[in-house]
A protein has these predicted regions:
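Glycine-/small-residue-rich beta->alpha transition segments that form the dinucleotide
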Residues: 27, 31-38, 86, 180-193
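Conserved beta-strand-loop-beta-strand element in the redox core of flavoprotein oxidoreductases
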Residues: 13-25, 144-175
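A conserved FAD-binding loop/helix module that cradles the flavin
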Residues: 233-258
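Single conserved hydrophobic/aromatic residue that forms the stacking wall/gate
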Residues: 1-11
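Rossmann-like NAD(P)H-binding beta-loop-alpha module
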Residues: 66-101
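Active-site-proximal substrate-binding core of FAD-dependent oxidoreductases
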Residues: 115, 255-263
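FAD-site-proximal beta/loop scaffold in flavoenzymes
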Residues: 46-77, 161-237
C-alpha cells in the first residue's frame, strides 16, 4: 500500500557487489540477523545424531507443511539431550516432546536463576516433562559413529562477568555420563561479519555485532551515513518483536536522513 517491493535471491547474484548495490539507493538497511551456530568446542560434536538447533527446528516446521521434508529429523521414541539454556533450547525441548521423544533432558552449565531463557518458557518446559540438569557442563559427546551419551562435569558459580552473570567453574572429579540417542546443540547464535564491512565503514565489536553511531541524530545509522542496521546483528540474538521494533525505528531514521539530505 505504501509502495514497497521485495526482491528475493538478489544477493546470491555474483554480478552485484555491495558497492554497486549501495550506489543504487539513497540508504540501505542491514538486518542480516545472527545465523552462525555457536559450538561447544568439545569432542563428539560432529558425530551422527548430533544436530544444530536451527536445522532441527526448521525441518520440523517444513515437515508440517503439505510437502514432507526429506531432511526431517524425527526424534520419536528417542532419548534426547538438549545442550543450552536459551529460548531456542526451550523450543527444541518442547518440539522433541511433541514428536514423541521418550525422554528429554535439558542441560545448562549455570543454575536456573542464571538461565537466559524466559521464565515462562522454562516453566512450560518443566510442566511438559522436560528434566533440567542444572550446573552441568558438557565436555564430550560419546559415541563411535553416532552419539550414545554425553559426558558432563558439575559446575559451581563464582564471581560475575561483565554482563553481571555468575561464571561457572568446573568441580574436579565430578564427571557424570548420561546415555542418549540424540543430542541437540542449542548454544545460541553469533553474527557473521561480511568481508565488505570494513571497506564500507561498517564497524563491529569484539564479537562481531555491528556498531551503531550513537552520536548520530538518525536512529540506527552506522558510521557510513548511507547504511543503517538493527536487530540481532546489532544487539545479538534476541526476540523477533525486538528486531521489528528496531526496524521501525531505523525506518524513521532513514526517512529523516533522506529528507534532510534533499533539503
Amino acid at each position: 500500500q505504501v509502495g514497497s517491493s521485495a526482491a528475493s535471491d538478489v544477493y546470491k547474484r555474483q554480478d552485484i557487489s555491495f558497492d554497486k548495490f549501495l550506489n543504487m539507493f539513497d540508504a540501505v538497511f542491514l538486518g542480516m540477523g545472527t545465523y552462525t551456530y555457536m559450538k561447544g568446542g568439545f569432542p563428539g560434536e560432529n558425530l551422527d545424531c548430533v544436530y544444530d538447533s536451527l536445522p532441527y527446528l526448521n525441518s520440523n516446521i517444513r515437515n508440517l507443511m503439505q510437502k514432507k521434508d526429506n531432511e526431517y529429523i524425527n526424534l520419536k521414541d528417542k532419548t534426547v539431550i538438549v545442550l543450552g539454556g536459551g529460548d531456542t533450547a526451550m523450543d527444541c525441548n518442547r518440539t522433541a516432546l511433541r514428536q514423541g521423544a521418550k525422554k528429554v533432558y535439558c542441560a545448562y552449565r549455570r543454575n536456573e536463576s542464571n538461565m537466559p531463557g524466559s521464565k515462562r518458557e522454562v516453566k512450560n518446559s518443566k510442566e511438559e516433562g522436560i528434566e533440567f540438569l542444572w550446573n552441568m557442563q558438557p565436555v564430550e559427546i560419546i559415541g563411535d559413529q553416532k552419539a550414545t551419551a554425553v559426558k558432563f562435569m558439575k559446575t559451581k558459580l563464582k564471581k560475575t562477568d561483565i554482563r553481571g552473570r555468575e561464571i561457572p567453574v568446573i568441580v574436579p572429579n565430578s564427571e557424570k555420563i548420561i546415555k542418549c540417542d540424540s543430542v541437540i546443540l542449542a548454544f545460541g547464535f553469533r553474527p557473521n561479519p561480511q568481508s565488505w564491512f570494513k571497506e564500507n565503514k561498517i564497524f563491529t565489536d569484539e564479537i562481531g555485532r555491528v556498531k551503531i553511531n550513537n552520536i548520530s541524530k538518525y536512529a540506527h545509522q552506522t558510521n557510513n551515513p548511507k547504511i543503517f542496521s538493527g536487530g540481532d546483528m546489532v544487539r545479538g540474538s534476541d526476540l523477533v518483536v525486538t528486531a521489528v521494533f528496531e526496524g521501525r525505528n531505523a525506518a524513521k531514521g532513514i526517512i529523516d536522513y533522506i529528507n534532510d539530505k534533499n533539503k
